Amino acid sequence: MTETATDGHVVSIRDLWMSFPGKSAGQQIHVLERIDLQVTAGEFVCIVGPSGCGKSTLLNIVGGFLCQTRGEALVEGQPVSGPDPRRIFVFQENGVFPWLTVRENIGFGLGQKSPEKREKTVAHYTEMVGLNGFEAAYPRELSGGMRQRVEIARALAANPDIIYMDEPFGALDFITRLKMRSDLTRIWQAEKKTILFVTHDIEEAVQLADRVLVMSKRPATIQEVVVIDLPRPRDLDSHGYLERRDHIFRAMGMSVRIGESAT
């Protein structure tokens, strides 16, 4: 029976498997197995796991860029059949248009609005991401963090139902990543968009998410779901934060002490 969006799950994945053809004839590389996942409207969910385990593959299936080998992927109650403008991707790679200004990048895709509404929308999200005064700047004149703010503002301006984020801060330096996490938390609290966020950074996941999905090695399953029931903004020195962070490290077979393995 097909689940509807009224059940509260805007993303519903059931018994999903994914394989890719190998180099040899008939060879199959099994990436995902028995994936079950539900995401509620307005929820912030992070996905972590070993490098190459299939985190981005799962996100691309939900986003409509890949089709699963078997199983069911529903978004807003309908089978995923391809990319949808109501669902926006934000990638690690710089996705802003270098030939457009900040204002033009944020307003890209708003052609259906009247000039007045488009200008108001662009101004609102320019302010929200802290880019006032840079409206006429081109991407080459901005830092990496500022370019990511442009991309986030452009995604929000389109008023999507869901935002998929694939390691959007992975290429930024540590201090800028911390600032971007804080900014994204503030923006999410204001907008309450559904966000599905892939990251290799466990601390980032615990700082941002309502729930963290911990994936196993390939062929990956969701081996654990960790609820992060901590107030925002998160205190990175608090017992609750450190406890959940360390729990996820151990779930992935890692120690928080460099050079040690979890037992």
Pin down the residues of each PLM region:
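A short, proline-enriched helix->beta-strand linker immediately N-terminal to the Walker B motif
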Residues: 157-161
